[in-house]
Structures are given as C-alpha cells and as structure tokens.
Amino acid sequence: MPTETQLFDTAELFKVLGDSTRIRIINLLSEDEFCVADIAARLNMTQSAISHQLRLLKAARLVKSRRVGQQIFYSFYDTHISDIIRTAIIHIAED
C-alpha cells in the first residue's frame, strides 16, 4: 500500500501533467531528444514559453537535459512517463 507521501507525490506529478503544452512537449520528446528551438518550432510556440515548461518538467524529473556546445537537448528522464502518457491516450481513445 502506498504511503501518504507517495500519494501526495503522485498527485503532484499529475498536476505537472495537467497542462496541454507540457503534454505536447512530452509527446514530442517520445520521438527523440530536441533542443528548445526545435521544440518551439515544432509546437509553434516561443522559445521562452517552451523553456518555462521545460523547467517545470525538469524539476518534476520528467525530462533531463544535456549540453552540446551552446545548445541544451531535452529527453525523457526515463521511460515511465512515456508509458503513462501512452496509456492515458489509449484510455481517451476508447469508445
């Protein structure tokens, strides 16, 4: 049985996932790793808006980053999050 702390942390995770922009970013990162400029271009958003959302996702340990020269590339922290999103999309798509 989960502890109170685990239940609280799970609720916090779902709060972070409760934003359509962050879900769109996560969905994109399920394909590959991307830098902020590429994410912004693909989602038709500003780089500052994407950076803000990525900070929240990184703080929640949903994405990680790596620096290559002056660019920072973002990817999934681990595969658990893509499994959660995939399961949610399947659930929504059910008749």
Map each language-model feature to its residues.
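Amphipathic alpha-helical dimerization/coiled-coil segments
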Residues: 1-9, 78-95
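N-terminal helix-turn-helix DNA-binding core of bacterial DNA-binding proteins
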Residues: 8-48, 72-79
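Residue-level detector of secondary-structure transition/capping positions
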Residues: 33-34, 58, 89-92
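Alpha-helical residues within the helix-turn-helix
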Residues: 41, 52, 58-59
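Recognition helix of helix-turn-helix DNA-binding domains
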Residues: 48-49, 54-55, 67
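Beta-hairpin "wing" of winged helix-turn-helix
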Residues: 58-68, 75
